[in-house]
């Protein structure tokens, strides 16, 4: 029996091109990229190249604004706890009631630690009320807004670019984070253009035909944020731990593939719906 897999929003198969790009760093180029000897410089250059690729994908942000992590859950934790560590005078967080558990459970932990969290409801269509969002913001008190870009259960797309703009116009001191795990490669995200008010963005590799066990966090230069995972100097001191070179290379290759096939993929996906008979 032939398996027809229709759950790519849960996880994806590693693309053959991604696996091919990864293999050298699992077999021959296995050196620690932090080491000073010559063989280790290859993996170090591979990470630097991957960082540039990811930066280009998001509209040409600075490569040093990309922090590689182990997954979107780590990225979300790093974004939220890091923003609050850098804004200790503010104790209020705004999020939605329909976030992924990687955000919701962090917010519940924040409440146990004494923070106040506003959970914005959605309507029967899963959409967010922008007016309620504006009312929830508290200038001088709100440290962080964390709102997903696309919901992992309903598929509803939240107007993150607009919400980030509103938050910054209300209070430039508010840090805006979005979990873009379900939207990266499916929707355009230009962090130098429409999404320029977003401070922190997280996503994962296994949703985009890269392997499980790798993700990234965009940290805009100048954003109020402090590192979450402490230890060594890796990732510019923003995420300690020896880098997973092969998986980082795979993540970047997956984004390259997505960028090169986006128009064709969108045409192919939209064609069946365009061909459906319409009611008179």
Show the residue positions of the predicted features.
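Pyridoxal 5′-phosphate
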Residues: 1-280
